[in-house]
Amino acid sequence: KFTTAHGKLNLPAEYGLSWMLPKIVGLGRANDLLLTSRVFTSDEALTLGFVNQIFEPAELVAQTVAYAHQLITSVSPNSLRQTRWQIYKDLHRDVASAVIESERLIEDMAMEEDFKEGIAALVEKRPPDWPSIK
């Protein structure tokens, strides 16, 4: 279960929740959750996009490890790092600035060994062996 209980305690939406929640679930849904301070279930959290998946407690660690394994074996570490940076940076930019920056990054990253390995792995239909983690 989840809640934004601040309203029931005479507190404001704390720790940036009023900034973050609308970006995750949309303005209307964020208003509902923040203004009512109601409890919502994991199923509703999934529907809202607040969480990506739901697992039984006994499965949580194994599923988390499987997800991490998928990331580190299929996605370039450089791409992960750069994309994560872009996601958070682009929250504060307009789309034109984001596109310009992505074009610059493409030029830079296309010169890296991980790019060459990614292309080779795709063509050869095999898992990549990222040079950046050797």
Label every model-predicted segment.
Residues 1-34, 63, 67-68:
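CoA-thioester-processing core
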Residues 21, 45, 83, 122:
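Terminal peptide-recognition signature
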Residues 33-34, 71, 86-90, 105-110:
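Helix-loop "lid/cap" segments that line or gate small-molecule binding pockets
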Residues 38-44:
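Acidic, divalent-metal-coordinating active-site segment for phosphoryl/phosphodiester hydrolysis
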Residues 48-49, 125:
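Structural motif
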Residues 51-100, 129-134:
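C-terminal long alpha-helix characteristic of the crotonase
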Residues 118-134:
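Short, basic/aromatic-enriched C-terminal tail that caps enzymatic domains
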